[in-house]
Amino acid sequence: MAVYTQVSDEALAGFLAGYDLGEALAFKGIAEGVENSNYYLETRKGRYILTLFEKRVNAADLPYFIGLKQHLSSKGYPCPEPVMGLDGQALRTLEDRPAVIVTFLDGLSPRRPTAKQCRSLGEGLARMHLALADFKGHRENALGPSSWRRMWDGRGADAEAIQPGLEAEVNACFERINAARAFSANLPRGTIHADLFPDNAFFLGEAFSGAIDFYFACTDALAYDLAVCLNSWAFEEGNATDASRLEYNFSKGSALIAGYQSVRPLEAAEREALPALCLGSAMRFFLTRLSDWSSTPAGALVKPKNPLEYAARLAFHRKIESAEGYGA
């Protein structure tokens, strides 16, 4: 479950007294998400989401995340907008946790995205990058390339335990990533979402209606954000009983890239780097999943995601030599 910190009625009432939102009419925990405690809140003024940031979140990063969403909202980009308290501050404290109230975003997250939704998502991602072009905040990518080798050291046996031969496959991927790092460092950079999976995007029908969960946002290559989306939107299960059997849906990937380029055309260097960026983003999620898979105790409330899903992506990307391989 996603609610790690329980909020009493008395604590909620005292917290809301610091806002001009009226009294609570409805308040319930939200099951989605694994990083923070999230609640649906309805007051006489409207619908909101209340988030309590758990200890795994670096409190020093919270002003950056809040400022980012305020910036996007000021540009008219659809995302949850932080609500200011009577003291003019968005970040407050509830149940000994940093907490923030944001506006409610209409829409649903797609379970099986369509090609039209992928195109609309690509457009939305590019519009986000343009809207953030003049955002002054800066945050290093804590899960970027400089962290991957450290995350991998000592994990070879864990990889072999879930799939024989996987250690050698990962090492081969590292060789290719390392060869491309110097080139990738010169790509256009800016503020990226870095985690725009289907459960972090909302749609009204086939149309993208907004993005949520910016708590991995950072400063990095813009095309890396596109690579994250290709990994999370354009692969489908080839075998429902075998997580290692995934297939790249060329139509969805092509639609996503086309949607992005209709708003922000990729530079030649970004197109050339796309295979390496896709491989790198797959490595990032493989390593975090492998770590969770190996360290989460049996019977834990939060079930870790299978790293083999991203091992399959690594194997796919190693075979791709150009952006055309993704439908660009």
UniProtKB/Swiss-Prot annotation:
EC assignment: 2.7.1.39
The family this protein is said to belong to: Belongs to the pseudomonas-type ThrB family.
Pathway connected to this protein: Amino-acid biosynthesis; L-threonine biosynthesis; L-threonine from L-aspartate: step 4/5
Keyword field: Amino-acid biosynthesis, ATP-binding, Kinase, Nucleotide-binding, Threonine biosynthesis, Transferase
Keyword Nucleotide-binding carried by entry: yes
Entry keyword Membrane: no
HAMAP family xrefs: Homoser_kinase_2 (MF_00301)
GO biological process: threonine biosynthetic process
Descriptive protein name: Homoserine kinase
Any one Gene Ontology molecular-function term assigned to this protein's record: ATP binding
Protein origin, superkingdom: Bacteria
Catalyzed reaction equations: L-homoserine + ATP = O-phospho-L-homoserine + ADP + H(+)
One Pfam family it belongs to: APH
Signal peptide positions (record): none
Alphabetical list of PANTHER family matching this protein: AMINOGLYCOSIDE PHOSPHOTRANSFERASE DOMAIN-CONTAINING PROTEIN, AMINOGLYCOSIDE PHOSPHOTRANSFERASE DOMAIN-CONTAINING PROTEIN-RELATED
Disulfide bonds: none
NCBIfam families per record: PRK05231.1 (NF003558), thrB_alt (TIGR00938)
InterPro entries in the record: Aminoglycoside_PTrfase, Homoserine_kinase_II, Kinase-like_dom_sf, Pseudomonas-type_ThrB
